[in-house]
Amino acid sequence: MLALVRELDGVAVRDVARPQRREGYIEIAVGASGLCRTDLYVADGVIPVEAPRILGHEFSGVVSYVPAGSRYTIGDRVTAFPICATDRTIAGYGGEMLGVHCDGSFAEFVSVPESVVLPIEKALSYEEAAFSEPVAAALAVLKADLKSHQRGCIVSAGRIAELVSRVLKTQGLIVPVISPQVEEIKEGFYDYVIESAATFETWQAAVRAVKVGGVIVAKSRSVRPVEVPYLELVQKEITVKAVHYGSFAQAVELLNSGALHVEDLVGNRASLLEYRDVLTSARGGEQSKQFFVF
C-alpha cells in the first residue's frame, strides 16, 4: 500500500506492507485523512518519532478487516479516536497516538483497536467525518465549566477558532471569535477567554481581555515553549484552565446528527503523491483543512 512515511532524513511516499492483523484490531481502508499541526511537527522533525513512521491521525473510511467476534462488518463506514488507551491514559494523555507512537492514517489502510472505532452516517463525507478528532478537541473547552450567562470570546483566527465557536454553539453558548490583529479587544470585559493559537500575541490579548479573577482556557497545543505575560497573569489573579480532549463519542454524534456542520472548513483534497504541495500549503495557514483522499 502507499503511505506517507517519516524517515530518518525527511518524509516520502513509500510502498509499504499493509498493517499486520492483530487480535482486537480492525483494519480500515482510509477514505480521507486530514492534516493538522501535529502532522507538520512530525514531518518537520519537531516531534521526534521512531522511523520509519506513517503519519496521520484524523481520518475516516471503510472497515476492510475485522477479527472474530467483532461488532463491525467489512464495509461499515467508521472513524476512530487516534489515541489508543493505556493504563497511563488520562483524557487522551499518555496513550499511543496514531502517526506519532504507531503508524497512522496517511496510508491506504490503517489498523486500530476496535475499542476506539465508531460508526459514521452515510450522509457524512469522509472529510467531514475526519473532523471527529478536532471536534473532540474543541469539546474539551467545556471542562472549564462555561456558563451561558458569562461573557466569553475566542482569541485567535482561522479554522480551529471557528470550529470551537461552532461546537460551543451546539451547547447553547454563543462565543465570538476575535482576531487581535484586526479587531479591538475590550480590556477586562470577558469572564473567560479561550486561547487557540498558542502565540505570545494571542496570550497577551487574552490576558488583556479577561476580567480580574477571570479564566483563560488554554485550548491550543504547541510543542514549542510559548511566552506569556506572566506578571499581568498574576496581578489579575487569572485562572488558567488547560484542556486536551472532550468526548470522542459526543463529537461523532454531533457530526452524525447534523447538529454541527463543517463542510465549509474542508480545504484542498489531494493524493499522497502531492504531499509536498499539501505540506507547503498547510504551513502557510489554517483557514481550511487539507486532506489526503484515497
Language-model features, listed with the residues they occupy:
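Glycine-rich beta-strand-centered segment in the early N-terminal region that forms part
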Residues: 19-33, 46-84, 121-124
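C-terminal hydrophobic helical "lid"/dimerization subdomain
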Residues: 249-294
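Residue-level marker of beta-strand positions
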Residues: 58-60, 76-77, 109, 140, ...
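Short SAM/SAH-binding signature in class I
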Residues: 190-196, 289
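Cysteine-cluster motifs in flexible loop/terminal segments that predominantly coordinate metals
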Residues: 36, 81-109, 113-118
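Mid-domain Rossmann-like dinucleotide-binding core that forms the NAD(H)/NADP(H) cofactor-binding site
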Residues: 122-187
